[in-house]
Every structure is written in C-alpha cells, then in structure tokens.
C-alpha cells in the first residue's frame, strides 16, 4: 500500500506543469508596402477563445485602427489569426504595424489618427509585436540602405504632395550618384524622398550636391535632415535641417537655411544665400551633446590640409538641441504647399555622396592580409563607409611614409601597397584621416 501511494504521488507531481509558458504573439505574414493582402500572425501559450488581437497601423505620422467596426481579431483554435489592415485611404502604405494580444473582454481604444499609441495597450496586453515595413524599391547607396517614400496616389506631407517611388523620381546612376526628381505625369506632380534604414546619432552628416541649386524654382524645396516619427521626442521630431528654397518668394535674395526644430523659436533658424551658379556644393552639420554646427562649402569638401571655400557657417547651442533617438536621415525634393513649379518644368537634383562621420571614428579592424605574385600588399579592413583612410608604412618604426589615401566605399574596404616585397620588411598602419 505504501508503495502504491508513493507512486501515485510521484505521477501527480510530474503531471503538473513545472512552469507557466509566457504568452507570445508573432507576425507570420506581413504584406509588402502597397499591397492590400491581409496581415497574419500566431498567438502562443494562451487559450485562443479567451484572447483577441488588436491591430494598429501607422500611416504618414498617425496611428489608426484599420476598422472600427471590427476592433478585435478572433484567434483560431490553432492560434492563427488574420486581419484586414487596408480598409480605406492610404492604409496600404502604412510604414509600421502593431499587434497586441489582449483578453477577449477588453475594449481597445478606437484610434482615428493619433501620433502615439495609448499606454493602456501595453498595460492591458499580455504580449505585443511591432514591425516596420520597408519600401519595395529600397536601395543601397554610399554604404547604407535606403527606403523610398511613396504615397500611393494620396497627398502626404510635406507639402502636401504626391510622392512616388518610381525610378523616374529616385534612382542611383552607373556612377553611383543619387538622383531625386520632381516629375509631371498625367497632370499630376510627383515628388521624391529617401529615408535611411538606420539612425546615425551624434556625428557629422555631409551631403555632396552636384547640381546647381541656387536657382531652384521658388516653389521647390530640397531638404537634407534628420527626423523622428515620434512627435513626443525631444527637439521637435529630433529634426535638424539643411533646406534649400525660396519658399515661393522669387524675390528673396536668400535661397537656403539651417534649422533646429521647432523653427518658430527665436534663434533656431538662419537664412543665407548659395552663390549664383555654385556647383558642386557641400553641406554639413555636426550634431553633438547640446550643440549643432552647420557649414556649407563652395565645392566638394576634402579633409585638411586641402581647403574648400566656405559659403557660410552657423552654430546653435540653444535649448532645442535634441538627444539622439529613433531619428532617420531624410533627403527630399518637394513642392511648397503642393504648388507646381511656376515655370512648369520638372526639377532634378543630383547628389554624388553622403558621408556620416562619427564624433570619434573607430580604428578600422583588419580582416586579412596578403602578398600577391606581383609583390603587391593587400590589406582588407572593416571601418565606416565614405570615410577617408590613410595607409602608412615604415621599415623600422622611425619615419612613417604615406602610401596613399582612400575613401571607403563600403564598411569593408581594401588598401594596397604596390611597392611591397617579400624580401623587404615593412610595417603598416591605417588611420582615419583627421579633419573630416
């Protein structure tokens, strides 16, 4: 009897769960941007009948429910669920999608355009997931990945305007130069905008503009700026701008401005003039803790000791300087107030390079070294795209001799010494060129 009782106790213990599984929600099928297909997912470690899914989409700066008529999505017995997220307007062009696993009895907030999701969704849900959709025409340029903005035939800001991701509006040519173009098609004007996939934070943002931009049509704006979709972020969307435009005032002798948002605050904006016919030009801003320094050059910037004439500089240390967060880098070409170019002509701006220089660039790491049959020394490194690197050599650690400089086209790059020889001892060092 004692043996049997003991065995039953052991079996009873083993049949009980050792620990509770954590509820989870995942997205199993996310339709590409522009698609009207449904969103699908999986709820795990919950009783399906006791829970529902609340889905929200983020379109052009606003969170909303795809439909107020069916605010909660039913979970099937196997944990799968499907939601129609394109119930009207520009829903197909949502850049973010959020799904919350909530109790069946929960009444979710019905959002028809708010800048942030209510905090109650986090406290009321047992699990959540958010995804960011990328552009179907995303591309790689200057060492980084970029999305192309499209409004799908709807008016989006800034402007508002129609934005197109067509290769008639945004493309990289065979020389590696980025083209942004405002086009006219079937009586409609389409603008262009690209957005970096990553945030960069503190450092120098440098734009090498090939085109003559002092004479842009008065209704046209060229914007080079950081921007955080979250309006509650410090510093007015963490927006720092180089903007080239006369803002529809053809008589304005100034054609450009540096801005720390919000621009309405006194001292957060300065206007200036790009010289007539100046091309190429280089426009930069260095963002650091509590400070931003802007500078524009008449020509392609190169590090010292070379020099390029400065057009203007401006520094701001006011209270609007943001700290880094989830800002992305934007480059756009658009129409002020959505007004067509006054001359009726299409507009194009070509940018040869973009470079980001961290405040303290890291020393590149060596991936491999080799000496080929011709005696050329090859050094494969990993650093930062578009930075200048200097290769030097020495036979005895006395005098270091410069062997050459290069701009790293990608994070991985190569330096070479054609004068190397297996019969001669040499030591090498690689450094980030100062003054970038």
Residue ranges and their predicted role:
Residues 231-279, 291, 334-337:
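Glycine-aromatic-enriched beta-strand/loop faces of beta-sandwich-type recognition domains
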Residues 66-81, 91-93, 102-106, 135, ...:
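Aromatic sugar-binding interfaces of carbohydrate-active proteins
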Residues 6-17:
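Bacterial N-terminal signal peptides
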Residues 134-232, 236-248, 306-309, 327, ...:
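Low-complexity, Ser/Thr/Pro/Gly-rich disordered linker/stalk regions
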Residues 21-134:
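Ser/Thr-rich low-complexity repeats and stalk/linker segments
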Residues 205-207, 279-287, 292-296:
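Short tryptophan-centered beta-strand motifs in secreted/extracellular beta-sheet-rich domains
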Residues 32-33, 195-205, 271-279, 322:
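Extracellular/lumenal carbohydrate-interaction signature centered on repeated Trp-anchored short motifs
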Residues 361-436:
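Short, composition-biased motifs enriched in small/polar/acidic residues
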């Amino acid at each position: 009897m004692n043996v049997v009782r003991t065995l039953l106790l052991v079996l009873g213990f083993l049949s009980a769960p050792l620990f509770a599984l954590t509820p989870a929600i995942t997205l199993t099928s996310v339709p590409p941007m522009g698609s009207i297909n449904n969103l699908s997912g999986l709820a795990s470690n919950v009783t399906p009948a006791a829970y529902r899914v609340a889905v929200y989409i983020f379109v052009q700066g606003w969170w909303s429910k795809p439909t107020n008529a069916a605010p909660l999505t039913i979970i099937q017995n196997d944990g799968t669920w499907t939601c129609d997220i394109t119930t009207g307007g520009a829903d197909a062009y949502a850049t973010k999608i959020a799904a919350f696993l909530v109790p069946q009895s929960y009444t979710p907030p019905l959002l028809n355009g708010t800048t942030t999701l209510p905090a109650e969704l986090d406290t009321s849900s047992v699990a959540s997931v958010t995804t960011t959709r990328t552009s179907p025409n995303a591309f790689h340029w200057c060492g980084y990945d970029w999305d192309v903005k499209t409004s799908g035939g709807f008016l989006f800001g800034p402007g508002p305007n129609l934005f197109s991701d067509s290769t008639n509006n945004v493309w990289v040519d065979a020389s590696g130069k980025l083209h942004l173009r405002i086009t006219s098609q079937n009586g409609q004007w389409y603008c262009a905008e690209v957005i970096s996939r990553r945030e960069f934070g503190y450092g120098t943002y440098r734009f090498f503009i090939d085109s003559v931009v002092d004479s842009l049509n008065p209704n046209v704006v060229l914007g080079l700026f950081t921007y955080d979709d979250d309006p509650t972020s410090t510093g007015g969307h963490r927006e720092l701008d180089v903007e080239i435009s006369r803002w529809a005032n053809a008589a304005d002798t100034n054609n450009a401005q540096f801005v720390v948002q919000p621009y309405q605050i006194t001292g957060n904006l300065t206007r200036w003039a790009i010289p007539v016919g100046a091309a190429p030009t280089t426009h930069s801003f260095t963002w650091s803790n509590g400070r931003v320094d802007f500078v524009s050059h008449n020509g392609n910037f190169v590090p010292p000791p070379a020099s390029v004439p400065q057009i203007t500089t401006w520094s701001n240390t006011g209270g609007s300087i943001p700290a880094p967060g989830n800002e992305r880098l934007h480059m756009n070409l658009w129409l002020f107030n959505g007004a067509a170019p006054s001359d009726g002509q299409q507009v194009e701006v070509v940018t040869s390079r973009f470079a980001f220089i961290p405040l303290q660039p890291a020393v590149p790491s060596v991936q491999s070294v080799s000496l080929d049959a011709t005696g050329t020394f090859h050094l494969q490194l990993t650093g930062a795209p578009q930075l200048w690197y200097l290769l030097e050599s020495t036979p005895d650690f006395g005098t270091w001799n410069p062997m050459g400089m290069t701009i790293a086209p990608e994070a991985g790059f190569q330096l070479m010494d054609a004068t190397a020889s297996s019969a001669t001892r040499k030591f090498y060092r690689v450094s980030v060129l100062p003054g970038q």
